[in-house]
């Protein structure tokens, strides 16, 4: 389990006491109040497809897949961005198109840009919208540097895999502004400088 990508410095496995008094350790990528689902279990997968179908039948226009990169677990791997995760999104997209054409799947993955855009798939088979997590810290960087060149160059370089995909642009979220999405866009020294400035300003 030491290879698993950790988005937070909290225990990966959390002990829970079952109704019979026994203790079971459950996978908690983010915190003890967010237990991960085991999509490798047919029962879990069917239950989640039922949930998806419920929302589609109720007329949902958007289906947001939260922290989608962590959906599948294989011990000995980083347990993020695995091929099985992409296959699940493709399954959800196929179901959505069959049951409620026009409903949009949006993925939320607070990761570096190159990993984030992988959730578009080939532009036809995964998410139609992807949260643009690099935008908030790049805007923050531009404000702190009083220089928009990096932001502007990055924005002009963006490409979508098809006309059926787009970005979900935002400037902050309930999680704040993460700096991990800057990796691969800014030098590490610029990221560390931004961290120092933010710490100084409280």
Q: Residue spans of the language-model regions?
A:
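Short glycine-enriched, charge-decorated loop/helix-capping segments at active-site entrances
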Residues: 77-82
